[in-house]
């Protein structure tokens, strides 16, 4: 059975590209036609590309690989957070902090600070500190959580990125290239597909389109890791019976 159907893609509006005046000629191979000044994406190609990306993500996750979901534009923020959490992966949905990949040690220091602040809140340290100081510490904690909450359990650079809108996330793309981290991305008609290892041609502006495609990548992870959980249960059962 296909990973995704043409009907699902049509209903979510995945086929709507950008206005014809805002396009990247390299996307020509993924464009079906032009209608009312808007490019229509060839969904037959999208179906195949989703399948290729799905298989890559599933195989990577099955090998224990970690995927970082990235989408900071408004239309992507909720889907990126929800789907990454659903499949047990990491996400950045606010602002990409420069050096998140290329200077991960510094980012880890900020994450350690966030975890220390959370511990202080949990163990009652905040209760014995002056009110003014607590207000400042909570403000700092909230800010760190906002930008780093989705990667606070990520112990090293990820094995792949899943990106919504490579133009918007160009710093993330550049950092991934520097470290040879493969990139899966929803690529609209105004983007450069040559920058992406696994191109998913589609609308990166419609919430439903973004949710559908992001959800499929999360499904790929779940398919891989659900197998692992079953294996763990089997091993436990064997040990108990033995």
Curated annotation (Swiss-Prot):
Q: Which Pfam families match?
A: Ribosomal_S2
TM regions (residue ranges): none
Q: Which UniProt keywords apply?
A: Ribonucleoprotein, Ribosomal protein
A single GO CC term, please?
Answer: cytosolic small ribosomal subunit
Superkingdom of origin organism: Bacteria
What InterPro entries has UniProt attached to this entry?
A: Ribosomal_uS2, Ribosomal_uS2_bac/mit/plastid, Ribosomal_uS2_CS, Ribosomal_uS2_flav_dom_sf
Q: CDD domains, alphabetically?
A: RPS2 (cd01425)
Q: Which GO terms describe its biological process?
A: translation
The terms under GO molecular function for this entry are: structural constituent of ribosome
Q: HAMAP family given for it?
A: Ribosomal_uS2_B
The entry assigns this protein to a family as follows: Belongs to the universal ribosomal protein uS2 family.
Supply the PANTHER family for this chain: 30S RIBOSOMAL PROTEIN S2 PROKARYOTIC AND ORGANELLAR, SMALL RIBOSOMAL SUBUNIT PROTEIN US2M
The protein, known as: Small ribosomal subunit protein uS2
Q: Which organism is it from?
A: Shouchella clausii (strain KSM-K16) (Alkalihalobacillus clausii)
């Amino acid at each position: 059975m296909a990973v995704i159907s043409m009907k699902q893609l049509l209903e979510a509006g995945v086929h709507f590209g950008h206005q014809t005046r805002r396009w990247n000629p390299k996307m020509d191979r993924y464009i079906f036609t032009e209608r009312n000044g808007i490019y229509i994406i060839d969904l037959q190609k999208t179906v195949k590309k989703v399948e290729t990306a799905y298989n890559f993500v599933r195989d990577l996750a099955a090998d224990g690989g970690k995927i970082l979901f990235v989408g900071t534009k408004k239309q992507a923020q909720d889907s990126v957070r929800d789907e990454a959490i659903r499949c047990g992966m990491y996400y950045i949905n606010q602002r990409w902090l420069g050096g998140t990949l290329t200077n991960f040690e510094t980012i880890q220091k900020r994450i350690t600070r966030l975890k220390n602040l959370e511990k202080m809140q949990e163990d009652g340290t905040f209760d014995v500190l002056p009110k003014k100081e607590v207000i400042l510490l909570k403000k700092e904690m909230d800010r760190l959580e906002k930008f780093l909450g989705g990667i606070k359990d990520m112990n090293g650079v990820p094995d792949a990125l899943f990106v919504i809108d490579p133009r918007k996330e160009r710093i993330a793309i550049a950092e991934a290239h520097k470290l040879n981290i493969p990139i899966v991305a929803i690529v609209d008609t105004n983007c450069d597909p040559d920058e992406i290892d696994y191109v998913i041609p589609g609308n990166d502006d419609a919430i439903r389109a973004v949710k559908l495609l992001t959800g499929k990548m999360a499904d790929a992870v779940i398919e891989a890791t659900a197998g692992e959980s079953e294996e763990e249960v089997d091993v436990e059962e064997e040990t108990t019976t033995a």
